[in-house]
Amino acid sequence: MRKLLPLLLFVACATQQAPPPPAAPALPAEPHGLTIEEEASILGLEDRREHDAATIGAWVAHPNPQHRLRIALALGRIGAITKTGVPELATLSKDSDRRVRETAAFSLGEIGLGAETLFALAADSDAGVAAEAVEALSKLSADKSLLPRYLAIADNAATEGVRARAVRYLLRWDDDTASEAARRALGATSSAVRQEGAYALSRRPYAGARQELLLLMTDPNTLTRAYATTALGRIGDASAFDALRDALGDAHPWVRTNAAIAIGRLAEKSRDVLNADDLPRVFATAEDPDAGVRASMIDVLGYYAERNETARARLFQTLRNGTLWERELSAGAIAKHLPWSEASEVLTDLTPWQIVRVLEATAAMPHGVELRKHYAAHADPLVRANVLANIPETGADAEADIIRAALTDADVIVRAGAYERLGFTSDVPLQTLRDAVESERTAPMNDARLAAIAVIAKSDAPSLQPLVADPDPVVRRVAAEAVKAAAYTPLTVSRTPEEYAEIVRWSREPHTATIHMTRGNIELALLSQEAPVTAWNFAQLAKKKYFDNTSFMRVVPNFVIQGGDPRNDMNGGPGYAIRDEINLQKYTRGAVGMALSGPDTGGSQFFITHSPQPHLDGGYTIFGRVYDGMSGVVDQTERGDRVVTIAIDEHPPVADISISNVSLPLEVGPMTADRLLSRVPDYAQRKTDYVPDGTVLEMMKPYIHPGDHVEVYMGTWCSDSQREVPKFLRILDDLRAQYGVELPVQFVAVDRSKQQPAELIAGKHVEKVATFIYYRGDAELGRIVEHTQSPLFEDDLLTIVAK
């Protein structure tokens, strides 16, 4: 079944010698405070999607907040299918524990009900709870009557983080009124709000925001620039071309990648935006050090090649001498952009994936029919399946002979494609399809059977009623949706209580996975508490060597790399499906998610995000995070890169290290606040999320003297710095904005040995980072080293300045 989606190097920041090999982060031994049997029973309820009123009622009223927290999450997983649990979640929304309220909000969003409860939670005194409630409200966007109240939050929320979250998910409302609110957010003084406004507009084109988006192309925030670039490309106005061309020279590959894609969108609308004078920049970007940027430029090069011989020669050169991935993309670009009489001269001796790109590019072209006939009997099932996939729906009758011949193909994915295309012919043989539903029961994969069922559903859905009780859970779901069944059992549950207990015991220990590739290693921390069944399934497959000699068969620049398919064509799986374990984890950079083709269809395919992808939150199970290998391996991975093996628990865990920091850059030398916010992942969001105690800042104000200043020695690569420096940046902003106090600061980024830059760090005795040194004139008043002593950063700062 085709699965689609829509570095921190862990060393202690105090270490002065070269860091040891990376070790994975630890998790608490018993993070939920539940017995093995209790947790196992909840896993069983989730598997069965069973709303056991007695058990749920007891846990909702349980004196232990850990029980209430766990049942709040379970209600969302069960209710997403059964639409039950809303009253219980309404009760939990008033819980004294903020985590319970936050999870209740999340679960109501997963169910898609409980608007009034969510609006109440959106006004919660805890910003984290309120933000989660706002995100959940956006999942109720089918009810347009809720939009005015949602817009009030997006425009006026008092807490910056809550407003930013509301602005982010304006995209889900699919409404110009919501897009206009996103446009208004682009003018916010808050960097986080501007970023989320640009993100919302990057997901839905809105021409009314064009001018504001152009201004954001030079914003200091990398994500804001990247999102604005995509948004302008989706609008497709030629007036944005110069700004997009200039963005090819941006300092960050995310922006350059998005600029290349955006230029392609403009060129698709009108070739007149292209100018031969731009070719030096185009050629330079085609040799970018980032693999995703290079890949994204190939189609752009194809547009120029339509009119320019030099560009054409460059495209041919990439076909001959590029990497495997680049040669595949070049074949598609040549087939798409050049006359077939010329393209056919160079598109010879193609690999199967090159043929796939050519078939995709020529699907709607006159010569596409002949190409499909030529490749219909190709030896590789990847090619045969893509021949069928690229038959236009309106042209199925003309190629019915290819379709019918494929009905008896030896490969199940090819047969699936044949049944699917058969549904677009003028004379659909329903009996043939009904026979296939039965004959395909014994196939190693259910794709062909599902394809036949989907075609039957178009014209004879009632006949599928018996399949609502089919042994295959995915067949049950598809059939139930077709006949509008009120309820069905989502999964066949064959696990015993002892097996659930085994999963729980395993999940209570920290676990790691090492993806060994020819390109290098990717180190994962498995989120065995947040997604125990998914993480367990992944680990068991790895131990069975299931992933050996697979590849990352799908790479989308600045989005994801996807692997886990032994067929290496995005259609393979282990022959079974596991249920979703949607959780509160977010798709930030380096998140590891389970690829799906519908609810509860996960198996073995997984993906890793290059950059934040908030639209995936709450839709795909996150079961791991990269803690080493992002910049050096994930970012450079190309389609087809081989996975040698995946090893479980190859590295022992190390306690007290956060796994939320991914691929932090290593910079050395003087830094500015703007550069920190734009270059280091999560700094801007962490600054936004931190809310200093205003009374402490007010007390601090009279103690800050003229001539006071602070030197901050920090590591852009360091988790302690990433935790503490954004707090300090927020305090500086609030002192300036609310109390008119300017406190000069010098930021110095040091290397891991704390020896560089030698001229700035000499004599400072910096042994740990982050180190904040407060001076009055030339005299040091005190310093904050690595961790604050008080719960609030501003308390430690007040202690120093009040000396």
PLM feature segments, named:
Residues K764-Y775:
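Structural micro-motif
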Residues P63-N64, S96-D97, S125-D126, A158-T159, ...:
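Short inter-helical turns and helix N-cap capping residues of alpha-solenoid HEAT/ARM repeat scaffolds
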Residues I413, Q431, E438-N661:
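Cyclophilin-like peptidyl-prolyl cis-trans isomerases
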Residues G777-K803:
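Non-catalytic, surface beta->alpha helical segment in thiol-disulfide oxidoreductase systems
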Residues E38, R68, R101, A130, ...:
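Residue-level detector of extended alpha-helical repeat arrays and alpha-solenoid scaffolds
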Residues Y713, V741-Q756:
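Thiol-based oxidoreductase modules, predominantly thioredoxin-like and allied folds used
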Residues A24-A26, R49-A61, A80-K94, G112-A123, ...:
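Amphipathic alpha-helical scaffolding segments comprising HEAT/armadillo-like alpha-solenoid repeats
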